[in-house]
């Protein structure tokens, strides 16, 4: 019996390495790595791979197997059902924990001025599969998630979102132009531009914002409160009260407003001073925008509506506080900033005028300028408005109240809702009004607002009565009152149905706000912020979002 040719066994180890010597390597395709060496490469990486792991896990450079799943690999294609299953199976607590650990390391490296390490950690974060998942989740949970960019693309299904994760790469990345629309500016008849990126560009901005945020928080002015993690307008108002309330506090205030801040920041300044991949940043800044089917270039500014824009604006304006501290040490010069609005106190008017020129010079380098119309110097006895509140001393006592403009805006907003609600059911109207009433009252609950709440309750009642009369022009007062208002406990005239009740402004009790510690960093002072949230014992949607930032490692109790 004639035997056939023997089957050649697959080459492994040395045999495979020898087999590639003639055909692989220099001048030809890359040599194939023996399959048996794969685990060695993981356990004992060399070259750039070793450097990257050393950044993540220190000198040993060993990467636990569970972390390998966080690195983005280009796998075989999956069906929509497979992708949807992968997205729905993501453990978001672990994702947030992984990203937060890297962000914490970036913040520590910034604090220690280890800029080379900062760049390596940023690279690791922006190429992390977990960070990409989180970036996609961020943009698909925002209010504008159903507003497409110029390409008309939306990520609605779980499959869309998982597919988007694999598309987040810096290789040959090119940002699409933004879609420009104009929206009404609150309290005015004018409109302001809003630029809408595509979904993929939003996610890329969110991804790089994750790597930039620890830097922004660590290097920020201590008295900057806008677009900051766990800081609020209420913190700014409490600090302003501390600076101005005492008998010997400074009496002059420079109210500063930057003209078109987001639209005019110098691109060159950003590229030379912001620690971020310069190629990617250039793509964000130079994308241009489309309006009325025409493409316009963007030579200045960061687009309003961009995910990363608030971070870039804050980084541009940080430094004013330290500049004033150097120029005017121990001279009652206090600086408070919220986004592009700021206050500077001064003991005399002449010093306030001098400070205005110092800030003007600081802004010029960054391509910005003060608004001549809105930048004014005011005496505390005359009062001034800041962030929707009026600050004024009455016979030596500083009071903070809701400003007239803020009261006018909420009244107009309620009027617009009632105008739209001509055919709504009472339950639909109550749901719409409760959102507005509770939100406005919570914003002002920490100041002298009890009288204002009572007046607004009266205004709201009169508006509701007119609304009911328009719905039933042929019915009498008694019938209308019985139809829409009821008794609840000791209260008469409660606007309610069998299911829902309209909340009043005065239902919100005045409660003083505890100011955040000025030097606290959310990436380095985790226990402080956890204790702060536990102490408040108020679970709002905002505080739930904050808890998700810290909810890994151990449970949060006492809420």
PLM region descriptions:
Residues 193, 297-302, 415-429, 440-452, ...:
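Short, solvent-exposed helix-loop connector elements
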Residues 156-175:
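Amphipathic alpha-helical blocks
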Residues 286, 366-432, 436-440:
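A conserved non-catalytic segment of reverse transcriptases
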Residues 185-188, 192-211, 218:
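Hydrophobic alpha-helical hairpins/lids featuring a short glycine-rich hinge
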Residues 459, 463, 468-559:
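Extended C-terminal regions of large enzymes
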Residues 167, 171, 181, 219-223, ...:
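Conserved polymerase palm-domain catalytic core
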Residues 429-475, 482-484:
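Non-catalytic, peripheral interaction segments enriched in hydrophobic/basic residues
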Residues 1-162:
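Non-catalytic, polymerase-adjacent accessory regions of viral genome-replication enzymes
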């Amino acid at each position: 019996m004639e035997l056939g040719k023997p089957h050649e066994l697959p080459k492994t180890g040395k045999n495979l390495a020898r087999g590639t010597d003639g055909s692989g390597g220099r001048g030809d395709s890359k040599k194939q790595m023996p399959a048996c060496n794969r685990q060695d490469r993981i356990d004992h990486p060399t070259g750039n791979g070793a450097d990257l792991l050393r950044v993540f896990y220190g000198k040993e450079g060993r990467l636990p197997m569970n972390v390998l799943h966080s690195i983005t690999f280009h796998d075989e294609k999956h069906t929509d059902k497979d992708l949807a299953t992968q997205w729905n199976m993501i453990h978001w607590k672990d994702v947030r924990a992984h990203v937060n650990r890297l962000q914490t390391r970036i913040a520590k490296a910034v604090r220690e001025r280890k800029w080379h390490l900062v760049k390596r950690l940023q690279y690791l974060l922006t190429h992390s599969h977990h960070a990409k998942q989180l970036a996609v989740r961020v943009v698909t949970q925002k209010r504008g998630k159903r507003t497409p960019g110029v390409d008309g693309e939306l990520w609605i299904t779980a499959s869309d979102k998982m597919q988007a994760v694999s598309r987040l790469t810096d290789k040959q990345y090119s940002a699409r132009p933004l879609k420009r629309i104009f929206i009404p500016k609150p309290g005015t008849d004018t409109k302001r531009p809003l630029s809408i990126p595509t979904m993929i560009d939003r996610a890329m901005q969110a991804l790089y914002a994750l790597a930039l945020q620890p830097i922004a928080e660590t290097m920020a002015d201590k008295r900057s409160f806008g677009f900051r993690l766990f800081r609020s307008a209420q913190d700014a108002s409490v600090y302003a009260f501390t600076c101005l309330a005492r008998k010997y506090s400074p009496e002059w205030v420079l109210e500063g407003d930057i003209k078109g801040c987001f639209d005019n920041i110098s691109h060159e300044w950003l590229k030379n001073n912001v620690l971020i991949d310069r190629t990617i940043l250039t793509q964000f800044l130079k994308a241009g925008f489309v309006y009325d089917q025409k493409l316009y270039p963007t030579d200045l500014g960061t687009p309003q509506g961009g995910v990363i824009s608030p971070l870039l604006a804050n980084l541009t304006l940080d430094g004013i506080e330290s500049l004033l501290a150097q120029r005017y040490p121990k001279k009652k010069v206090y600086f408070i900033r919220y986004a592009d609005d700021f206050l500077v106190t001064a003991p005399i008017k002449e010093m306030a005028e001098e400070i205005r020129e110092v800030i003007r010079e600081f802004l010029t380098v960054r391509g910005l300028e003060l608004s001549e119309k809105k930048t004014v110097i005011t005496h505390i006895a005359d009062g001034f408005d800041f962030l929707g509140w009026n600050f004024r001393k009455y016979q030596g006592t500083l009071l903070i109240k809701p400003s007239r403009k803020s009261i006018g805006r909420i009244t107009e907003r309620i009027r617009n809702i009632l105008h739209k609600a001509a055919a709504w059911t009472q339950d639909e109207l109550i749901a719409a009004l409760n959102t507005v009433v509770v939100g406005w009252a919570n914003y002002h609950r920490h100041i002298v607002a009890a009288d204002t709440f009572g007046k607004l309750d009266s205004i709201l009642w009169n508006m509701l009565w007119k609304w009911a009369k328009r719905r039933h022009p042929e019915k009498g007062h008694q019938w209308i009152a019985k139809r829409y208002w009821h008794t609840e406990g000791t209260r008469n005239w409660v606007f309610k149905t069998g299911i829902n009740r309209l909340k009043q402004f005065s239902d919100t009790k005045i409660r003083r706000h505890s100011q955040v510690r000025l030097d606290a960093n959310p990436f380095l002072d985790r226990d402080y912020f956890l204790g702060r949230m536990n102490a408040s014992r108020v679970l709002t949607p905002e505080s739930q979002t904050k808890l998700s930032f810290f909810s890994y490692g151990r449970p949060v109790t006492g809420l």
